[in-house]
């Protein structure tokens, strides 16, 4: 008698894993990677690892089962071809941003859809998510907006001081 479990039990475990990853991820991106070389996929994985982003390749049928279980049936039409699933653990946009930036240099990778704030977004929506500023960019913009009035006041004070001299 063999030690291997039935295939359907292994598949059920993978579906549970996918459900768990989707639930715990801040954001999910789905990209088609047809014709992407192993070297390029490795490069993408290395970039993802640096940003605490998980990249997984699952059978679309298993992701379909997980999507149905989570009530994300709008995701099902995007589960065709060879897909890679990118799970962002830090914030909701970094998965989409990673794929969009990588796809600019690698036409074999195409951003297809994603899950943003618990909702399925199509290709247009996930590209919009990818174009949003990151947390660091937002902090920088906020700090600049706080400093602007102070800089303006300092310039006025310097102008007055120079006219008195």
Swiss-Prot record:
Name of the molecule in the record: Large ribosomal subunit protein uL10
Gene Ontology MF: a single term: large ribosomal subunit rRNA binding
Segment forming the signal sequence: none
Family note: Belongs to the universal ribosomal protein uL10 family.
Assembly and binders: Part of the ribosomal stalk of the 50S ribosomal subunit. The N-terminus interacts with L11 and the large rRNA to form the base of the stalk. The C-terminus forms an elongated spine to which L12 dimers bind in a sequential fashion forming a multimeric L10(L12)X complex.
Lineage of origin: Bacteria, Bacillati, Mycoplasmatota, Mollicutes, Mycoplasmataceae
Cited Pfam families: Ribosomal_L10 (PF00466)
Function: Forms part of the ribosomal stalk, playing a central role in the interaction of the ribosome with GTP-bound translation factors.
Gene3D superfamilies in the record: 3.30.70.1730
The organism of origin for this protein: Mycoplasma mycoides subsp. mycoides SC (strain CCUG 32753 / NCTC 10114 / PG1)
InterPro entries given in the database record: Ribosomal_uL10, Ribosomal_uL10-like_sf, Ribosomal_uL10_bac, Ribosomal_uL10_bac_type
Biological processes annotated in GO: translation
Keyword Ribosomal protein in annotation: yes
Any one of the GO CC terms: ribonucleoprotein complex
UniProt keyword annotations, A-Z: Ribonucleoprotein, Ribosomal protein, RNA-binding, rRNA-binding
Gene expressing this chain: rplJ
């Amino acid at each position: 008698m063999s030690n291997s479990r039935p295939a359907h039990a292994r598949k059920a475990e993978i579906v549970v894993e996918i459900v768990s990853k989707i639930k715990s991820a801040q954001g999910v991106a789905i990209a088609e990677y047809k014709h992407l070389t192993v070297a390029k996929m490795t490069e993408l994985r290395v970039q993802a690892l640096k940003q605490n982003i998980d990249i997984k390749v699952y059978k679309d049928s298993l992701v379909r089962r997980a999507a149905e279980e989570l009530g994300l049936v709008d995701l099902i039409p995007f589960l065709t071809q060879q897909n890679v699933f990118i799970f962002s653990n830090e914030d909701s946009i970094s998965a989409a941003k990673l794929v969009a930036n990588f796809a600019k240099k690698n036409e074999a990778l195409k951003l297809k859809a994603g899950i943003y704030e618990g909702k399925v977004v199509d290709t247009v929506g996930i590209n919009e998510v990818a174009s949003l500023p990151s947390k660091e960019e937002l902090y920088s913009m906020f700090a600049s907006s706080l400093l602007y009035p102070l800089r303006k006041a300092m310039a006025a004070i310097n102008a007055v001081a120079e006219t008195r001299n």
